[in-house]
A protein has these predicted regions:
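Terminal substrate-recognition subdomain of acyl/acetyltransferases
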Residues: 155-170
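Conserved beta-strand-loop-alpha-helix junction that forms the acyl-donor binding cleft
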Residues: 122-132, 149-155
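Short acidic/polar active-site loop segments enriched in Thr and Asp
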Residues: 81, 117-118, 141
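Acetyl-CoA-dependent GNAT
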Residues: 5-8, 14-18, 22-95, 104, ...
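Glycine-rich acetyl-CoA-binding "A-motif" of GNAT/NAT acetyltransferases
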Residues: 67-71, 130, 156
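Conserved GNAT acetyl-CoA-binding A-motif
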Residues: 113-123
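Conserved active-site alpha-helix within GNAT-family acetyltransferase domains
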Residues: 101, 126-144
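Glycine-rich phosphate-binding loop
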Residues: 98
Length: 170
């Protein structure tokens, strides 16, 4: 486990770690929870590498001192000053230890430093209480509910849209 003191570990995600990340996505349900409808075809190293080549996408990670992948996430740049935080995932063996919360804080800090974002948004399943609690703890608020938005395990599920203003004051 990494030190509990808050010290940013955020780095750009290296494509050569893609296979380690994709090992965490074991089922179709895992894929939908993690990526929504981003990968309509089968998720593979090739489709994920193609995804990482998007010009509107910045991908980030945390690594352990032993260089094992700990977290992954993305910021999508829109034409507006709103950025979308997407595809947040924590190593399944390291969940519920605060890494997701610190990782999201670091993504927000990166967005603030870019000075082109004034709002961050994200989506999560309405019944994903752990994710909702994590995002609320760092200041996200629920701004919309999209009923029956995604099919998961044969059941249509509601999505929650959350947002947080990005202040440029010190």
């Amino acid at each position: 486990m990494l030190k509990k003191t808050y010290n940013s570990l955020l780095v750009r995600f290296p494509k050569e770690k893609s296979s380690q990340l994709l090992e965490w996505i074991k089922t179709e349900e895992d894929r939908i929870i993690w990526s929504g409808n981003t990968f309509k075809k089968k998720l593979s190293i090739n489709s994920f590498t193609e995804h990482l080549n998007r010009t509107d996408l910045d991908s980030f990670a945390y690594f352990t001192p032993g260089n094992n992948l700990l977290t992954y996430g993305e910021v999508i740049t829109n034409k507006s000053p709103t950025g979308s935080i997407c595809r947040i995932i924590v190593n399944p063996m390291e969940r519920s230890k605060g890494y997701g919360q610190n990782f999201c804080k670091d993504l927000l800090l990166w967005m603030k430093k870019k000075e082109k974002f004034n709002m961050a948004t994200l989506n999560t399943f309405a019944d994903n209480q752990k994710a909702i609690n994590c995002y609320r703890k760092i200041g996200f608020k629920i701004v919309a509910r999209k009923p029956r938005s995604r099919k998961l395990g044969g059941i249509w599920k509601d999505m929650i849209v959350m947002s947080k203003a990005i202040s440029h004051r010190n």
